[in-house]
Regions:
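C-terminal catalytic histidine-bearing segment of alpha/beta-hydrolase fold enzymes
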Residues: 147-206
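Short beta-strand/loop motif that positions the catalytic acidic residue
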Residues: 126, 131-134, 138
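Primarily recognizes the serine-hydrolase "nucleophile elbow" in alpha/beta-hydrolase
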Residues: 22-98, 110, 114-115
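Short beta-to-alpha linker loops that shape the active-site pocket of alpha/beta-hydrolase fold enzymes
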Residues: 5-9, 90, 166-168
Length: 206
């Protein structure tokens, strides 16, 4: 497992996308030494990190990515993720947007780029199979974000597993004592199974 500490505000789009792309190239270039299966590179992101992961999965093949990384057309295909795990992701810049995420992501290019980062409209046949979970009562990033993305995945015939848990606040992580700290509201036993479900998904496909 590798963790990317990507640039946030004041850095703006597409800085983090390019950092993620460079990270994938580094991982694949060192796959043998690091004992990594090159065909099992899975992106996982939560909340705004979910937007980054899903965004990259949608645009990895676009010229602005390969140009930004200064790589050849052939090397472009080394960027393709094999799978995607999204936890309560920010997806849409439309009616159900988490607006502050897009203000920070786009900075002074907000009006110019807002529509292009509404990911339910960016899904294409090159997006990998995807696992998504969200809670019905998420008050920060509405569940519609995951529903919109899953609907777009289905429309593009992308294999998808979607779990909507009945209750729980935003940012639950593992939804247990390990990640809740002093926040009792982040201990939600009904949501804990997401990790085992994601593990089963990984074992089955990868």
């Amino acid at each position: 497992m590798a963790v990317l500490r990507y640039s946030c505000s004041p850095a703006i789009y597409p800085t983090a996308l390019l950092e993620l792309g460079r990270s994938i190239l580094i991982i694949r270039e060192n796959a043998g030494e690091w004992h990594i299966k090159e065909d099992s590179v899975i992106l996982q992101g939560c909340s705004a990190g979910g937007h980054l992961a899903a965004n990259f999965a949608c645009v990895w093949k676009d010229d602005f990515i390969s140009d930004g990384l200064n790589i050849s057309y052939t090397d472009k295909f080394k960027l393709r993720p094999n799978g995607l795990i999204l936890c309560y992701p920010v997806i849409t810049s439309g009616e159900h947007a988490h607006r502050d995420s897009f203000v920070k992501l786009l900075g002074d290019r907000y009006d110019e780029l807002l529509e292009s980062v509404s990911l339910e409209n960016q899904v294409n046949e090159d997006v990998p199979r995807t696992f998504i979970w969200h809670t019905f009562t998420d008050g920060s990033v509405p569940v519609e974000n995951s529903l919109l993305f899953a609907t777009a995945l289905k429309a593009n015939n992308i294999n998808t597993e979607l779990h909507i848990f009945p209750e729980g606040c935003h940012g639950l992580a593992l939804a247990n004592e390990l990640t809740a700290g002093n926040e009792v509201k982040e201990i939600v036993p009904a949501c804990e199974p997401w990790l085992s479900l994601a593990s089963q998904w990984l074992k089955f496909y990868f």
